[in-house]
Amino acid sequence: MTPKRLPSLLFLLLAALTIAALIGGCGAPAAEPPAAEPAEPAAPAAEPAEGEAAAPTSLDFVVWSYGLETIQDNINNFQAANPECQINLKDYSWLDYHDTMVGRFAAGDPPPLLYGSDHWLQEWASAGWLAPLNEPFPQVTDYSGELAPYALQGMTYNDDVYGLSYYADTIDFVYNEDQLKAAGFDAAPQSWQDLWDMSVALKEQGITEYPMILAFSQSEGASIEAMISMIYGRHTGEGALFDANNQPTFNSEGSAAYEAIEWLRQAYEAGLLDPASLSTAEIDQVKSMQSGAHTFTILPQYNMAELNKPDSGEFAGKFKIALMPGDSHATVGYVRFYAMSPKAAEMGDAALACSWKFLEYFGGKTDGTYTVVKRWAVENGLGFAQLPLFQDPDVQEAFGKWGDVDVIAAQAELARAKEGLTPWFGAWDVFTRAEIHKAILGQQSTMDTLANMEAEWNRLAAQ
């Protein structure tokens, strides 16, 4: 019967399907998915359009707050000649500059370009905060032979050159010629006794209540240079403060340092030194002299252009430079300079290249001329380390308007770098300012002041 045959038919049907499947499985393998077509090469980055410059390399430049309009104009001129470099100017008050920059260094935030000074160089260079210029730029030493020795010394640490001079100058003794003549004197003081006698006469005759003013504010960075100049003028040769091994030589009664501080103490007590000196900074010192309130002062020479500026007051043109009073007439010569931090190299080759172009443009020669240095000299009366500029007719004419060029040159020849320039000099300087104040005010003896100065020096040296 048909129903009895169904299992057989089902069996045959299933068998046929199984065989077909096996035959299919033994056939050619299924084709692999097609390999992806190679991607078209990416189009090359578009070249800058013809005449279109790449973005300039940006460098920060930090200065103290003097002549900012002139600085920015010099930057503009530099950028016009070097469009691949962009300089960003930032300034801090001179009174705060050292501490502000130390704070930035310590915080890991140094600018690649900045102002430096001889009395901070050893501190900053030994800490690695400044970069020696002669390593990436060996050509910097080509300028060394044209620099005043005291200036080159002030930019050198461990035989490496750390700067190109922004300006270099002497600390000068300045007097009001009209007032001195009114008191009956025809010549400037040659000794500190002369200065005392003239000051007494000026005070007694009512010409000036306080014949002398100094910028001895404890925040005035140039005060130590004025103090050392008073010491140098009394001392002949090296060793006025420190010997060749940076050991103190000043801590003895009768030393030039003792005599200088004693003179100030006695002048303060006698009413010859204005008490305001102990809180006066340089700008106010200049204004006070211009007003006729004082006859004598000691200050950086570049201030002479401002003192004798036409129409600046009754005594414009009447302020004269004299050699520093004392047996040797020596004074301090100092340098402020353009410096570079290690950050410039960290920023790469383009930053280094722009840094050198900037440094040479500002502190070196452009087309064979010290263009920027000469501008500061002619327009602002800034002194300079670049000796060939003394022969420049424009400089001679400009300096002759506010000073006796022969006296300026004579004092420059007698100028000496500060002794004791070490990594701890800056810290000792700040300590010393306060100690000298105590002596002037009679809060402690001059010998106690000198002893404290020596003890602090030795403590710092031992660290």
Task: Cite the ranges covered by each PLM segment.
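Short, low-complexity disordered leader/linker segments with a strong preference
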Residues: 1-60, 80, 448-451, 455-463
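Hinge/lid segment of periplasmic solute-binding proteins
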Residues: 47-51, 118-172, 190, 196, ...
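Extracytoplasmic "Venus flytrap"/periplasmic binding protein-like
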Residues: 76-147, 156, 162, 178-190, ...
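Extracytoplasmic/periplasmic substrate-recognition and gating elements
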Residues: 80-81, 107, 181-183, 248, ...
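Short, solvent-exposed loop/beta-turn-alpha elements that line the ligand-binding surface or hinge
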Residues: 134-147, 218, 234-259, 309-314, ...
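Extracytoplasmic/periplasmic solute-binding protein
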Residues: 157-166, 171, 196-248, 265, ...
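Glycine-centered hinge/linker elements that transmit conformational signals in sensory
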Residues: 199-200, 245-278
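Long, aromatic- and glycine/proline-rich binding clefts that accommodate carbohydrate-like moieties
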Residues: 319-322, 373-430, 438
